[in-house]
Regions:
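Active-site gating/metal-coordination segments in enzymes
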Residues: 139-187, 193, 227
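Active-site core of metal-dependent hydrolases
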Residues: 173-227
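Metal-cofactor-binding active-site regions of metalloenzymes
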Residues: 90-96, 100-101, 116-149, 172-179
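Histidine-rich, glycine-flanked metal-binding segment
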Residues: 5-12, 17-62
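Hydrophobic faces of well-ordered beta-strands that scaffold small-molecule active sites
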Residues: 64-70, 95-97, 121-125, 169-173, ...
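Short, acidic/polar
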Residues: 76-85, 150-161, 210-216
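Acidic (Asp/Glu)-rich catalytic clusters
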Residues: 112-116, 158-166, 216-221
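Metal-associated gating/positioning segment near the N- to mid-region
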Residues: 47-48, 55-116
Length: 227
Protein backbone atom coordinates (compact mmCIF):
# COMPACT_ATOMS: atom_id res chain seq x y z
CA UNK A 1 0.00 0.00 0.00
CA UNK A 2 2.32 2.72 -1.23
CA UNK A 3 0.92 6.23 -1.22
CA UNK A 4 0.64 8.02 -4.58
CA UNK A 5 0.46 11.40 -2.84
CA UNK A 6 3.26 13.86 -3.64
CA UNK A 7 2.15 17.05 -1.84
CA UNK A 8 4.88 18.11 0.55
CA UNK A 9 4.18 17.35 4.20
CA UNK A 10 5.43 19.38 7.14
CA UNK A 11 6.51 16.31 9.08
CA UNK A 12 6.87 12.62 8.29
CA UNK A 13 7.43 9.82 10.79
CA UNK A 14 8.64 6.59 9.22
CA UNK A 15 8.45 3.02 10.45
CA UNK A 16 6.69 3.59 13.75
CA UNK A 17 4.04 1.38 15.30
CA UNK A 18 0.83 3.36 14.91
CA UNK A 19 -1.85 2.61 17.50
CA UNK A 20 -5.25 4.27 17.19
CA UNK A 21 -7.81 2.80 19.62
CA UNK A 22 -10.73 4.59 17.96
CA UNK A 23 -10.18 3.00 14.54
CA UNK A 24 -8.59 -0.21 15.80
CA UNK A 25 -5.38 0.45 13.86
CA UNK A 26 -2.23 -1.23 15.18
CA UNK A 27 0.36 -1.46 12.40
CA UNK A 28 3.86 -0.38 11.47
CA UNK A 29 3.39 2.39 8.90
CA UNK A 30 4.59 5.80 7.75
CA UNK A 31 2.53 8.83 8.71
CA UNK A 32 2.69 12.41 7.45
CA UNK A 33 1.34 15.66 8.87
CA UNK A 34 0.47 18.99 7.29
CA UNK A 35 -0.91 22.08 9.03
CA UNK A 36 -1.10 20.16 12.28
CA UNK A 37 -3.24 17.33 10.90
CA UNK A 38 -2.61 13.85 9.52
CA UNK A 39 -2.26 14.20 5.74
CA UNK A 40 -1.20 10.69 4.72
CA UNK A 41 -0.88 7.21 6.18
CA UNK A 42 0.50 4.16 4.36
CA UNK A 43 2.90 1.25 4.57
CA UNK A 44 5.39 3.46 2.71
CA UNK A 45 5.43 7.17 1.95
CA UNK A 46 8.77 6.99 0.18
CA UNK A 47 7.59 9.14 -2.75
CA UNK A 48 6.18 11.94 -0.60
CA UNK A 49 8.43 14.92 0.14
CA UNK A 50 8.44 16.39 3.64
CA UNK A 51 10.13 19.31 5.35
CA UNK A 52 11.16 17.04 8.22
CA UNK A 53 11.57 13.26 8.10
CA UNK A 54 12.31 11.15 11.17
CA UNK A 55 12.88 7.42 11.41
CA UNK A 56 10.91 6.30 14.47
CA UNK A 57 11.37 2.55 14.06
CA UNK A 58 10.80 0.76 17.35
CA UNK A 59 8.70 3.59 18.74
CA UNK A 60 4.95 4.00 19.20
CA UNK A 61 2.88 6.70 17.52
CA UNK A 62 -0.55 7.24 19.05
CA UNK A 63 -3.10 9.93 19.82
CA UNK A 64 -2.32 11.87 22.98
CA UNK A 65 -2.61 9.74 26.10
CA UNK A 66 -5.00 10.37 28.99
CA UNK A 67 -3.61 10.17 32.53
CA UNK A 68 -6.58 9.51 34.81
CA UNK A 69 -4.79 10.16 38.12
CA UNK A 70 -2.63 13.27 38.32
CA UNK A 71 -2.12 16.24 40.62
CA UNK A 72 -1.48 19.28 38.45
CA UNK A 73 -2.70 22.06 40.77
CA UNK A 74 0.81 23.52 40.95
CA UNK A 75 1.02 25.97 43.84
CA UNK A 76 -2.37 24.88 45.17
CA UNK A 77 -1.15 21.68 46.80
CA UNK A 78 2.30 20.36 47.65
CA UNK A 79 1.53 17.37 45.41
CA UNK A 80 1.03 19.58 42.37
CA UNK A 81 3.27 19.43 39.30
CA UNK A 82 3.24 21.44 36.07
CA UNK A 83 1.45 19.43 33.40
CA UNK A 84 3.26 21.18 30.56
CA UNK A 85 6.62 19.96 31.84
CA UNK A 86 5.48 16.33 31.55
CA UNK A 87 3.62 16.14 28.28
CA UNK A 88 6.59 15.94 25.89
CA UNK A 89 8.17 13.13 27.92
CA UNK A 90 5.00 11.13 28.53
CA UNK A 91 2.89 11.65 25.41
CA UNK A 92 0.05 12.76 27.70
CA UNK A 93 -2.23 15.49 26.38
CA UNK A 94 -5.14 15.07 28.81
CA UNK A 95 -4.41 15.31 32.53
CA UNK A 96 -7.20 14.43 34.95
CA UNK A 97 -6.50 15.95 38.35
CA UNK A 98 -7.53 13.56 41.13
CA UNK A 99 -9.04 15.82 43.75
CA UNK A 100 -6.35 18.42 44.40
CA UNK A 101 -9.11 21.03 44.71
CA UNK A 102 -12.45 21.04 46.48
CA UNK A 103 -15.43 23.38 46.41
CA UNK A 104 -13.45 26.07 48.24
CA UNK A 105 -10.60 26.36 45.76
CA UNK A 106 -11.68 24.73 42.49
CA UNK A 107 -12.22 28.19 40.98
CA UNK A 108 -8.48 28.83 41.34
CA UNK A 109 -7.67 25.49 39.74
CA UNK A 110 -9.94 26.33 36.82
CA UNK A 111 -8.74 29.90 36.29
CA UNK A 112 -5.01 29.51 36.82
CA UNK A 113 -4.37 25.91 35.73
CA UNK A 114 -7.04 24.52 33.42
CA UNK A 115 -8.11 27.61 31.47
CA UNK A 116 -4.68 28.91 30.37
CA UNK A 117 -3.22 25.50 29.55
CA UNK A 118 -2.77 24.37 25.95
CA UNK A 119 -3.40 20.85 27.24
CA UNK A 120 -6.75 19.35 28.17
CA UNK A 121 -7.01 19.49 31.95
CA UNK A 122 -10.01 17.98 33.74
CA UNK A 123 -10.66 17.34 37.42
CA UNK A 124 -12.29 15.19 40.04
CA UNK A 125 -13.58 17.57 42.70
CA UNK A 126 -12.58 16.63 46.22
CA UNK A 127 -15.46 16.12 48.63
CA UNK A 128 -13.36 18.03 51.15
CA UNK A 129 -14.00 21.77 50.84
CA UNK A 130 -10.27 22.51 50.99
CA UNK A 131 -9.12 19.76 48.63
CA UNK A 132 -5.86 17.95 49.37
CA UNK A 133 -4.42 20.50 51.75
CA UNK A 134 -2.66 18.41 54.41
CA UNK A 135 0.66 17.78 52.69
CA UNK A 136 4.00 19.54 52.67
CA UNK A 137 6.98 18.74 50.46
CA UNK A 138 8.66 16.98 53.37
CA UNK A 139 5.81 15.68 55.55
CA UNK A 140 2.78 13.82 54.16
CA UNK A 141 -0.58 13.80 55.92
CA UNK A 142 -0.04 16.74 58.24
CA UNK A 143 -3.79 17.16 58.17
CA UNK A 144 -6.31 14.49 57.08
CA UNK A 145 -8.67 16.51 54.90
CA UNK A 146 -11.61 14.11 55.33
CA UNK A 147 -11.48 13.68 59.10
CA UNK A 148 -13.36 16.87 60.01
CA UNK A 149 -16.90 16.29 58.79
CA UNK A 150 -17.50 20.05 58.75
CA UNK A 151 -15.34 20.19 55.62
CA UNK A 152 -17.49 17.61 53.82
CA UNK A 153 -20.44 19.73 52.75
CA UNK A 154 -22.35 17.90 50.05
CA UNK A 155 -24.34 20.97 48.96
CA UNK A 156 -21.22 23.11 48.55
CA UNK A 157 -19.65 20.36 46.45
CA UNK A 158 -22.71 19.92 44.22
CA UNK A 159 -22.98 23.67 43.64
CA UNK A 160 -19.29 23.95 42.72
CA UNK A 161 -19.53 21.00 40.33
CA UNK A 162 -22.41 22.68 38.53
CA UNK A 163 -20.39 25.90 38.30
CA UNK A 164 -17.62 24.16 36.36
CA UNK A 165 -19.27 21.62 34.04
CA UNK A 166 -16.55 22.20 31.44
CA UNK A 167 -13.93 20.40 33.50
CA UNK A 168 -15.37 18.46 36.45
CA UNK A 169 -15.64 14.77 35.54
CA UNK A 170 -16.16 13.19 38.96
CA UNK A 171 -15.88 13.33 42.74
CA UNK A 172 -12.78 12.34 44.73
CA UNK A 173 -12.67 11.12 48.31
CA UNK A 174 -9.70 9.91 50.35
CA UNK A 175 -10.46 7.65 53.30
CA UNK A 176 -8.52 5.53 55.75
CA UNK A 177 -6.41 5.97 58.86
CA UNK A 178 -4.33 8.79 57.38
CA UNK A 179 -6.85 10.52 55.11
CA UNK A 180 -9.99 10.47 57.26
CA UNK A 181 -8.89 9.39 60.74
CA UNK A 182 -11.81 8.10 62.76
CA UNK A 183 -14.53 9.28 60.37
CA UNK A 184 -15.17 5.74 59.17
CA UNK A 185 -17.38 5.39 56.10
CA UNK A 186 -18.95 8.84 56.48
CA UNK A 187 -16.73 10.67 53.95
CA UNK A 188 -17.43 7.98 51.35
CA UNK A 189 -21.15 8.10 52.03
CA UNK A 190 -21.23 11.87 51.58
CA UNK A 191 -19.16 11.65 48.40
CA UNK A 192 -21.49 9.03 46.98
CA UNK A 193 -24.49 11.27 47.68
CA UNK A 194 -22.85 13.97 45.58
CA UNK A 195 -21.96 11.47 42.84
CA UNK A 196 -25.54 10.24 42.64
CA UNK A 197 -27.02 13.75 42.58
CA UNK A 198 -24.66 14.94 39.85
CA UNK A 199 -24.57 11.71 37.84
CA UNK A 200 -20.77 11.56 38.00
CA UNK A 201 -18.37 8.74 38.90
CA UNK A 202 -16.68 8.52 42.29
CA UNK A 203 -12.93 8.03 42.69
CA UNK A 204 -11.94 6.57 46.06
CA UNK A 205 -8.42 6.57 47.50
CA UNK A 206 -8.04 4.11 50.37
CA UNK A 207 -5.01 3.92 52.64
CA UNK A 208 -5.06 1.77 55.80
CA UNK A 209 -8.13 0.57 57.75
CA UNK A 210 -10.43 1.67 59.13
CA UNK A 211 -12.65 1.38 57.17
CA UNK A 212 -12.15 -2.14 55.90
CA UNK A 213 -11.35 -2.35 52.19
CA UNK A 214 -14.05 -4.92 51.48
CA UNK A 215 -16.60 -2.61 53.08
CA UNK A 216 -15.46 0.20 50.81
CA UNK A 217 -15.56 -1.95 47.67
CA UNK A 218 -19.04 -3.23 48.48
CA UNK A 219 -20.25 0.36 48.86
CA UNK A 220 -18.87 1.52 45.53
CA UNK A 221 -20.95 1.39 42.35
CA UNK A 222 -20.22 0.00 38.88
CA UNK A 223 -18.18 2.61 37.03
CA UNK A 224 -16.64 4.09 40.17
CA UNK A 225 -12.85 4.15 40.48
CA UNK A 226 -10.61 2.63 43.16
CA UNK A 227 -7.20 4.22 43.45
Amino acid sequence: RDSPMTEQADLMLKGGRIIDPESGLDEIQDIAFKDGKVSALADSLATMPAKQIHDVSGKIISPGLIDLHTHVYWGGTALGVEAESLTSRSGTTTFVDAGSAGAGNYAGFQRFIADPSKLRILGFMNISFAGICGFSKTTPNIFPECEDIRLLDARECVDAIREFPQSVVGIKVRIGRYASGNAGMTPLQIAREVAEETGLPLMTHVDFPPPDRDEVLNFMRPGDIWT
